[in-house]
Structure formats: C-alpha cells, structure tokens
Design a protein with these regions (language model features):
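Short, well-structured beta-strand/strand-turn elements
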Residues: 76, 145-151, 245-246, 342-344, ...
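Periplasmic/cell-envelope proteins involved in peptidoglycan metabolism and beta-lactam response
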Residues: 1-289, 309, 318, 393-403, ...
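Beta-lactam-recognizing serine transpeptidase/beta-lactamase-like catalytic domain environment
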Residues: 73, 201-212, 260-324, 328-564
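Ligand-recognition elements built from short beta-strands and adjacent flexible loops
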Residues: 471, 519, 533, 541, ...
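Acidic/histidine-rich, surface-exposed loop or edge segments in extracytoplasmic proteins
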Residues: 75-83, 115-120, 213-223, 479-482, ...
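Extracellular/periplasmic catalytic domains that process cell-envelope and extracellular macromolecules
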Residues: 73-75, 157-161, 216-217, 247, ...
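Short secondary-structure junction motifs
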Residues: 145, 249-252, 340-342, 407, ...
Length: 739
C-alpha cells in the first residue's frame, strides 16, 4: 500500500489553493468595481439599450405668420417609416423589401440590405403623406409583418409657394431652418423633441403597451412678421412684370417699409424660388439661361443659379445707388445750412473737377436752374457743386450718420455692408455726390431715405413683429415683442420737411413724374447707375435702374424702393422703367393701407365709376338716373324702354365716359375697329377714340400731360368692338425722366 501525500505537501497545496482563491476574489472584486462603479454609466446605458427601444417624437414646428396672422409657413402632420431588422423574421425580409419599395417607390435591394442588419432602427422614408401611411398599415396587417413601424412626424409647407421666400427661408430634411427666418429664429420655431420608450424582451420584440413611457414633444413657438401679404403680393407682381418686360438679366429687388417704425411690409428679390422645393430651379428666366449650356456645363451652372436664386438682393447684393443718393447729399447740405431754396446753378452739360471732366446725363446741359429745378432735373454738375460745399470730411460723417458704413441690423441673415472709397478726395467726393463709385445695399438706401423723410430719425429696419405661443383654446399669447429702435437723429425735422417738399416736386413735374399716382402726394427720386465693375471686368455696359420714394409726401408713412438690375430690352433710365413700377405698386397699396386719396378736379373726371344697370327701365327713368350721377349718355332707337346698354352693367368706366342706351329695334353691334394707339400722345389718342364713338381710360403713372405717350392698349389694335366700349391706354413719359 502506497504512502499518501506528506503533510508538508498538503500544506503547500492548501497555501497555493488559498493564494489562488484570494487572487480570484481580488480579480472578481476588480471586475465588479470596473463594471458597477468605474464603468457603471456605460454599462447601464448598454443594458437599457438592450432592454428598451427609444423612438424620437418630433415636435410641431412653430408657424410663421404675416402681420395679419395669415400663415406663410406651417407644419402639417406626416409620418416616417422605419424598420427594426432584428424583429423581422428571416422569411419576411424579402417581402418587407418588395412591399416597401413598391409603395414608397424606392430601390428594393437597398431596403433588403437594411433588413439584414443586426439593429433595431433603420429609417426607410421620412415625411410620407397620410394616404401612403394608411396603405402601409393595411399592407402590414395583410402580411402579418413584424418590425415595420410608422411614427408621427411633421412636414414644412409654404402655402403661398415663392411669396416672400427670401424672408421666410426654408428648412432641411431634419426640419431645422437653413435660411431666412426659419434659420434665424430656429430656436423659437423648432420646439423640443419628445420620446416614446418601449420595453423589449430578450429577442428584441416590443413588450405590451403598459411597458411604454411617453414623453410628450413641446411644440415650437410662432413667429409673426411685419410683412403684409397683400403688400408683398403687389410688390412681387409688379416687380416681376417689369423684370420680364425689361429683360433684367441680373434680376430685380424691391422693398416697402414704414419710415416711422422700420417695419418692412414687403421685400422681394428676383430670381426667386419655391421653399417647398428649394433645390429646384423654377424661375423661367433662369431656366432659359441654362438652356444655353451643354450637358457637361449645365450641372456646374445649375449650382451657380441655385446660389443666385437663394440670394436676397435687398440685403446681400451691393450696388451703386446713382441719383437716388442725391436725397442724402441734399439732406446733409440743407442741414448744414450750406444751400437753400434760393440757390441757383448753371449746367453747361459738364463740370471740371481737378483734372477730370465729369458730364451731366443731359449732354446739352440744363442751363440756369434753381435748387428745386436741379433736383427735378437730377443735374449731376449741380450736385457735384453741392457736395463740394459739404466737403469730404463732413460728407463722410453724414454718410456714416445715415447708417451707410454699417449693416442696418435687420433680423435677416447674410446682410452685407457697403463698399466705400479707399481714398476720399476731390474727385471721389464729386462722384459720390451723385451716387457713383461706391456701393451700398438696397436696404441701406431705403433706411437712409426713411431718415431723410420721417423727421430725421435713423430707424433699424426689421421683419419680425412678435413671438407667440399657441394656447389650448387656439388663441395666441405674445411671449416676445419687437419695438422700433431709433439709432440716432441724423437731420432736423425742419430739414426733413423741406426735403420732402422738394422731392414731391420731382414726382409732380420732374424726373420722377412716371411714379405719379392720382389722388396721392408721392415724393421720390429716380436713379440710373452704370455698373463700373462689370464694365472694367468684361467691357460690357450694364446699368441699375431705380426709383426710391415715399408717401404721403406731407406726412410720410411708407417708403418704396424699386431696383431693376441690368435691363436689356432697350430702356435703361430709372425715370422711364423703374418709376412706373413704383407708381403701380403705390396705386395698389396706398388705398389698401387706408391712406385716403385727395383728388383734384381734373383727377375726379378720370376716376372709374361703376356702370349702373339700366336695362328694362323706362328711358325717362334711365335718363334721370344718369343725370343725377352726372354721367353722359346717348340714346339709340325710338323706343320708350332701355333694352341694352354699352358699357355693360357692373363694369367700370371713367366718370367722363358716355353710356349708349339702346331702345326699340336698336342693338349694339361690333362694327368699330380699334386703331393702333401706341406712341400717340394721350391727347391725340383720346381724341381719336372719342371721334369713333368709343370711351377712353388712361392708366399709368404719368403726370406729364402732353409729353406722355401711349405704350400699350386694350383691346388690341384690330379688334372689332361695339360703340361705347372702353379702350384702356397705358401711358409713360420719356421726356425729362432720363435719370
């Protein structure tokens, strides 16, 4: 029988075993410390992730409203489709891919590859409409599928498409603002996301509803703009029409602003885009330009055109303001007492400054003129003389005081500051006096003119009126308001009033006469500036044609700027092509803005009246009614009852028109051929139409009398119409408005 282990051997084994056990315990303690203390948060997060499934609940993005609470940007409920690959049975993967690809019009193989992943979330498609979501639900039920889910989401809509697009901006696929108000006020608009936390079992399947935790999303706040959708509509309408008619290859820009508060009622820039599909080029002039490029160049040019349509020319692009800047030169010289209405100027068509000869736009010169006439004529030599009196130091100080060396501070992104001279001496002062060889933005220009007209106060322009929060009862609670900010007093109220008087005469008898609006006192200044930088770079001559003004001239409330960039249709002068646009806009918006007209007796005769219904009335009753309304008439036929009339009831006609009353067997017949009236004077066209038994309506913004010419007509020349038809002629003046 063999001997067992010796006592010493057992002792050694026991000691070794004890050491091993102690080491094991130390190691286990270390592991426990590592997992439960040192890396507790990490492993807790992993454990929770394995036991729960989080779904982010998107908040409703706040709306953007006009000042009248008309929705300009809204979020509508949609749904997002995603899959949980770990929850999809092996035999269902191809079915899931085929079905989703068919319903959502996506690539089947791409979806199938997502079903093979070992996770619990793969996004398939975001923001699908309710009808598509319902189709997916029906398909899930029909196929009895697991792992295909729909979750609530929101989609941004812009009900008015491209209207005010450069102010509103747009959002990206994640509903985060990328430009405009959507970007600047994103922190207010976006809200706070919620969560749906669902428990799941060991194989990744969701547990019943009672194991869910729901954290509600907090919806975003609403932004109320100073923009008036009606004013915005008219600004865009007339600006786009002018841009197309004048073939402005670099677009157009326009602003309507309250001169007292700095509130921007409308701001438009062309070319523009639809924020519902901001990546798509829809502007027809841009699309036509792209057709000139081959397939290889087109992609590169499309990128350039997208950048162009996204640019807000009102605040991003700088330009030479030309003669519209004479308002600022006039204001500073009057404020300093360096000139008065008693000053006179002589213009031979040029002026010598140092070693330069600077010419007036009128080659023969304006001759002897008063200060008022120099402004009406937009005489360059006169304003060079005025600028010289101010001097370079004082001139620059006023330039700075009018806010032209800094950004306006408008609550929009991308605002540029102006470009001033690197040196400012005698020649530079001369060209600056009439708005050449330096650059500012359109918004800087209208803000400066606002100060010149509102009593001398420089006001910060803004587009946001207030931030609101929608209450449970649907009402809006204001959580933040934006009040007018006056930066400084630039000129005195007395100087401002004199500037207004002088600029009103520019519109009544001067270069701005095409901006005249019946019944309203409009003041303003035209401008035509050469794009010197383009000339130097390419050798080609292009111009900026503009008009800036305000109304009412005796108590200014609203300023307007119209800028046409690089017109190529033939005319370039602001007085000819920009002033009429401003006049058309003002004619539409001033009555809407409750500015009451005050008509002269001559204007009253040209106003439209509603044509009364006289048919089936006795001839004597019809005559009495027309006599009472002071409307002229002519009777055809020998009956006692009015059987027909021309113009027709419910239409409109000028007060001075004649109504034809048909009685007995007499009937209106189309027997008069409308003549071609284009290029006729207003008087000549009116006389010819009247001699043919037709009525005339004169529209347009000309207060130029005999110098106004017909530029279009309706009905067109050659159309055959009945006696008494109203022929509308549109007029414009090209005399004395070339600047």
């Amino acid at each position: 029988m063999g001997k067992g282990p010796s006592r010493s051997m057992v002792k050694r084994s026991t000691i070794l075993l004890g050491i091993f056990a102690a080491a094991l315990l130390v190691w286990m303690a270390g592991v426990l410390v590592k997992y439960q203390i040192v890396n507790y948060n990490y492993y807790q997060t992993r454990a929770i992730a394995q036991q729960t499934m989080d779904t982010t609940l998107a908040p409703n993005r706040g709306s953007i409203y006009s000042r009248n609470y008309t929705p300009l940007a809204i979020s509508a409920p949609v749904e997002t489709v995603y899959i949980a690959p770990n929850s999809i049975d092996e035999e269902d993967r191809r079915t899931v891919a085929e079905g989703l690809a068919s319903i959502l019009e996506l690539d089947e193989d791409a979806i199938y590859q997502k079903t093979l992943k070992k996770n619990y979330y793969e996004m398939i498609k975001r923001r699908i409409d309710a009808e598509v979501a319902d189709e997916i639900r029906a398909w899930i039920d029909e196929k009895n599928l697991e792992g295909v889910h729909l979750v609530e989401d929101t989609k941004r809509y812009y009900p008015y498409n491209s209207m005010a697009c450069h102010i509103l901006g747009f959002t990206g696929t994640d509903n985060v603002g990328l430009d405009g108000i959507e970007s600047i006020y994103n922190e207010y608009l976006q809200g706070t996301s919620g969560k749906l936390i669902a428990a799941k079992n060991a194989i990744g399947t969701e547990l019943p509803y009672e194991y869910e935790t729901y954290v509600a999303a907090e919806n975003g706040k609403n932004v109320v703009l100073t923009i008036d959708e009606t004013v915005q509509y008219y600004l865009e309408k007339h600006l786009q029409e002018a841009r197309l008619e004048q073939k402005c290859i670099e677009g157009a820009a326009g602003i309507v602003m309250n001169v007292k508060t700095g509130e921007i009622l409308a701001m438009a820039s062309f070319p523009n885009y639809d924020p519902n599909n901001y990546y798509t080029i829809t502007d027809q002039m841009a699309l036509d330009a792209l057709e000139e490029y081959g397939q290889e160049e087109r992609k590169e040019q499309e990128t350039a055109f997208r950048n162009k349509i996204w640019r807000n020319k009102c605040i991003v692009d700088t330009y030479m303001p030309g003669s519209t800047f004479k308002i600022v030169t006039l204001s500073m010289a009057l404020e300093e007492g360096l000139i008065s209405t008693n000053n006179t100027y002589s213009c031979p068509g040029y002026i010598r400054v140092a070693d330069r000869t600077i010419r007036c736009w009128k080659s023969g010169g304006h001759g002897h003129q008063t200060l008022a006439q120099a402004i009406q004529n937009s005489c360059n030599p006169a304003f060079i003389s005025i600028g010289a009196k101010v001097g370079p130091t004082n001139f620059y100080q006023y330039f700075k005081n009018f806010g032209l060396t800094e950004k306006t501070g408008v609550d929009l992104n991308g605002e540029a500051s102006g470009i001033w001279f690197s040196k400012f001496q005698e020649v530079e002062l001369a060209t600056a006096s009439f708005g050449q060889n330096f650059k500012i933005t359109p918004l800087q220009m209208i803000t400066a003119v606002g100060a010149a007209s509102n009593g001398g106060k420089l006001v910060t322009p803004h587009v946001v009126k207030e931030i609101t929060e929608t209450q449970e009862d649907g009402t809006e609670k204001v959580v933040k308001s934006f009040t007018p900010q006056v930066k400084r007093q630039v000129i005195s109220a007395e100087t401002s009033a004199l500037v207004c008087d002088l600029l009103e005469e520019v519109v009544t008898v001067g270069s701005g006469k095409n901006a005249y609006v019946k019944g309203y006192r409009v003041a303003g200044k035209t401008g035509t500036s050469e794009k010197i930088d383009v000339l130097n770079a390419t050798g080609e001559k292009y111009y900026i044609s503009s008009f800036i003004g305000f109304a009412p001239a005796d108590e200014p409330e609203y300023a307007i700027l119209v800028m046409l960039d690089s017109p190529t249709a033939g005319e370039i002068y602001g007085g000819i092509i920009a002033a009429p646009v401003a006049g058309d806009i003002l004619a539409d918006i001033l009555p809407y803005l409750s500015i009451q007209p005050q008509y002269t007796e001559e204007e009253l005769e040209t106003l439209d009246v509603s044509v009364p219904s006289l048919m089936e009335q006795s001839l004597e009753e019809a005559k009495a009614l027309l006599i009472d309304k002071e409307i002229k008439f002519k009777v055809k036929g020998d009956g006692d009852t009015v059987l027909d009339q021309m113009p027709l009831p419910g239409s409109t006609m000028p007060q001075s028109s004649t109504i034809i009353l048909y009685t007995g067997d007499a009937k209106p017949s189309k027997n008069i051929t409308v003549p071609n009236l284009v290029d006729y004077s207003v008087a000549g066209a009116s006389d010819r139409i009247a001699s043919m038994g037709l009525n005339v309506r004169v529209v347009g913004n000309s207060n130029a009398g005999s110098t106004a010419l017909v530029i279009s007509q309706s009905p067109a020349a050659g159309e055959v119409v009945p006696e008494g038809t109203v022929v509308t002629i549109r007029t414009n003046s090209s005399v004395g408005v070339q600047n």
